[in-house]
Amino acid sequence: MLCSQLNPAKRKILFIDPGFPVQRSQVRILGIPSESFDIYDYRAEKLGPKIESYLAQGDVAAIVYSNPNNPAWICLTEDELRTIGELATRYDAIVIEDLAYLCMDFRKPLGRPFEAPYQATVARYTKNWILMVSGSKIFSYAGQRIAIAAISDGLFDREYPALRERYNIGRLGDAFVLVFLYAASSGTSHSAQHALAAMFRAAADGTLDFVGETSEYARRARLTKEIFLRHGFRIVYDKDQHESVSDGFFYTIGYGGMTSSELLSELLLYGICAISLTSTGSRQHGIRVCISQMNRPEQFTLLDERLAAFARDHA
């Protein structure tokens, strides 16, 4: 909402899909125009020209994506992020980078305080960024909902005449806090704020290995992927260019020539639920698998049995 009101000529949000379905719903509810494309065929050197084809129209206010990606768990490379950042600067667009799954590219030893490698981010390549970090994801702190929106200093302090005319507050950071957060949210509890601050402090001090804690998701993904693949399914978004995607919170599955809705409907008959890739903006056919609730050994056996029955009935 904020980004769409900074410049009357720029109201459109560009989604790099697939993405979190709720974000797409939000722009529809608010009546904000949007564009999107599926990154499946636009990795590496193909990404820049594709994004620029939208930015060159002159009406894109912000670019939105998640990294690691929900639902595909693909991770943009530093070169791809550099491309996005440089284009955002050139066309004066804001990058809203969803880092809900911070440091969960488990192929790399991330999350060690003040030691490389670090989380890949567009913030290295432009000043036009807003980073979103979720307490419920990186710290598995899902009870009292809380998150961080980190805004670059250059963007926070930037004056926008359109904001001043509309709200009598011209500085982006002030408008974000005093107008948009105040009016459009109920805030968050003091206890959640203290809890998140304590977890950030412990992570920075090296006493909380939050990446080690969340690596349990990679173990569950690895086990369930093996079961799906053994029964004839395939990973839809399977590569980060030439490298297999990391195991993590989500991944994507397809089966034969079934469409997303067909596969979802059929799996429900076997007691397996997911969401359709269509709802994520993907142009590929399949479903998103979430392993967060696969927390008991017998569930893996049950999944194996149900997928065996599915494969037998669809041979």
Residue ranges of model-derived segments:
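Phosphate-binding glycine-rich loop
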Residues: 1-12
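Conserved glycine-rich beta-strand-loop-beta hairpin in the small C-terminal domain of fold type I
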Residues: 190-193, 197, 210-225, 229, ...
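Active-site phosphate-binding strand-loop segment of PLP-dependent enzymes
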Residues: 41-112
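A short helix->loop->beta-strand "cap" motif at the edges of active sites that frequently abuts
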Residues: 11, 90-94, 126-127
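PLP-dependent enzyme catalytic core of the Aspartate aminotransferase-like
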Residues: 56-58, 125, 265-315
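Helix C-cap/helix->beta junction micro-motif
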Residues: 30, 90-91, 270
